[in-house]
């Protein structure tokens, strides 16, 4: 079977990656992220209607009233929990609720900005801790430059996913942050599979250049990469299309992340390691 020379395309891939990162960073800079209630603070309402109310119609009616930053959930007890972000015209919510008949306000709570600020710090700390752990693990298992290659691919994926949320102005909440961390782990797993095969082939194959070894290794793991990515992508796409608003919002991170992560494990991580090895003129990679 003919081998695909992936790494011959790395300069074009660098251009694609640079464009993705540039667009993402510009959007994050000028549009920002649509942070959810978990990060901004707001007000929580729990109401119970006398008659049965469809959650989809309720969500659409609230949105039509000009309230954009909100979440709505239906409980097992038949009540609706509505969370509205700070700065939204909450005074319109009462008028919306009246359209669905008589209702009882069970509770109303304020989520303070202090709590939200703490959540932001925890989210950033979780991401930085994950990045540090990955760098340490790969640096010990392979070489520091390999670890940096994986981190570069990981940063590429996270920035692109965040950029996609910024461009579409989808809400970023704690569930989305968790999804991004899962996507990060998925991306690293893909990269480690390729790196492992490269290390194995470096020991077995003699008389080949590093680029040839890398291309061979990527081709050998290609079927596994494609099957794993397609399986995950089909599942994520199904839930993204058929799931409700909250689930669709989370699955958006998986859809974008799986596509970008598969691409980066080949064209970012491996390409970076190859060019760094060439830069320092190291013919072989010393493995742990």
Swiss-Prot record:
Membrane topology label: Multi-pass membrane protein
Positions of transmembrane segments: 13-33, 123-143, 145-165, 175-195, 226-248, 252-274
Listed InterPro entries: SecD/SecF_arch_bac (IPR022813), SecD/SecF_bac (IPR022645), SecD/SecF_CS (IPR022646), SecD_SecF_C (IPR048634), SecD_SecF_C_bact (IPR055344), SecF_bac (IPR005665)
A Gene Ontology cellular-component term: plasma membrane
Main location: membrane
UniProt keywords, alphabetically: Cell inner membrane, Cell membrane, Membrane, Protein transport, Translocation, Transmembrane, Transmembrane helix, Transport
One GO MF term attached to the UniProt entry: protein-transporting ATPase activity
Taxonomic superkingdom: Bacteria
Cellular localisation: Cell inner membrane
Any one biological process term the GO annotation gives: protein targeting
SUPFAM superfamilies: Multidrug efflux transporter AcrB transmembrane domain (SSF82866)
NCBIfam families reported in the protein's UniProt record: 2A0604s01 (TIGR00916), transloc_SecF (TIGR00966)
HAMAP family: SecF_B
Quaternary structure and partners: Forms a complex with SecD. Part of the essential Sec protein translocation apparatus which comprises SecA, SecYEG and auxiliary proteins SecDF. Other proteins may also be involved.
UniProt similarity note: Belongs to the SecD/SecF family. SecF subfamily.
Function noted in UniProt: Part of the Sec protein translocase complex. Interacts with the SecYEG preprotein conducting channel. SecDF uses the proton motive force (PMF) to complete protein translocation after the ATP-dependent function of SecA.
Name of the protein described by the UniProt record: Protein translocase subunit SecF
Source taxonomy: Bacteria, Pseudomonadati, Aquificota, Aquificia, Aquificales
């Amino acid at each position: 079977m003919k081998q695909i020379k992936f790494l011959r395309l790395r300069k074009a891939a660098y251009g694609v990656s640079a464009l993705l990162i540039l667009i993402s960073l510009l959007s994050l800079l000028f549009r920002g992220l649509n942070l959810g209630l978990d990060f901004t603070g707001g007000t929580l309402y729990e109401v119970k209607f006398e008659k049965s109310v469809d959650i989809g119609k309720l969500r659409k009616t609230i949105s039509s009233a000009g309230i954009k930053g909100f979440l709505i959930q239906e409980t097992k007890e038949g009540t609706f929990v509505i969370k509205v972000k700070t700065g939204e015209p909450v005074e319109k919510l009462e008028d919306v609720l009246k359209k669905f008949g008589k209702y009882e306000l069970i509770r109303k709570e304020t989520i303070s900005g202090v709590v939200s600020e703490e959540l932001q710090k925890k989210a950033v700390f979780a991401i930085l801790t994950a990045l540090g752990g990955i760098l340490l693990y790969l640096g010990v298992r392979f070489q520091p430059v390999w670890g940096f290659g994986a981190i570069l691919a990981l940063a590429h994926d996270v920035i692109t996913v965040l950029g996609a949320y910024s461009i579409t102005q989808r809400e970023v909440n704690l569930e989305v942050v968790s999804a991004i961390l899962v996507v990060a782990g998925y991306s690293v797993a893909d990269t480690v599979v390729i790196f492992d095969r490269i290390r194995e082939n470096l020991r077995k194959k003699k008389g080949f250049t590093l680029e040839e070894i890398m291309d061979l290794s990527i081709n050998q793991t290609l079927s596994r990469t494609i099957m794993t990515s397609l399986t995950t992508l089909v599942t994520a796409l199904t839930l993204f299309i058929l799931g409700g608003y909250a689930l669709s919002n989370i699955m958006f991170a998986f859809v974008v992340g799986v596509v970008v992560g598969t691409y980066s494990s080949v064209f970012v991580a491996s390409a970076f390691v190859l060019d760094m090895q060439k830069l320092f003129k190291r013919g072989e990679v010393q493995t742990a």
